[in-house]
A protein has these predicted regions:
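Hydrophobic structural segments
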Residues: 1-126
């Protein structure tokens, strides 16, 4: 299976989604949140980076998840309990996490709102 450099994908997503131009919530972090070993052979997408979605992505053979709701939202607390399980699953599966919250909401072509407008066949949405 061919592999692609993780940083090449990150650069592409950062540029396409204008990660550095969109101001998000104070503690939200858009972009690469967790690195893997540096190579990507399959990408999974999910709304949330949860233990369930990470395990499902790993079961599908993915080692990069692109998510709308990433891991970092609030000032961080200790990674114990469920958070420990989540980080363990990421490491054991060499899974990278890339998150785009408001950049994905606002994107005129790839964004969630753009997709919804297209699905509803809305003409000239504002």
């Amino acid at each position: 299976m061919p592999k692609v450099d993780l940083q090449a994908i990150v650069k592409h997503c950062d540029r396409e989604l204008r990660i550095n131009e969109i101001v998000d919530y104070e503690d939200a972090h858009n972009g690469l949140q967790v690195e893997n070993g540096g190579k990507v052979h399959r990408i999974a997408a999910a709304v949330d980076a949860s233990l369930a979605t990470i395990c499902k992505a790993a079961d599908m053979g993915a080692n990069l998840m692109i998510v709308h709701h990433g891991l970092f939202w609030n000032p961080q607390h200790p990674w114990t309990g469920k958070k420990h399980d989540l980080i363990t699953a990421l490491i054991e599966n060499d899974m990278a996490i890339y998150s785009a919250h408001l950049p994905l909401d606002l994107h005129p072509r790839h964004g969630n709102n753009a997709g919804l407008c297209k699905a509803l066949k809305l003409k000239r949405p504002k």
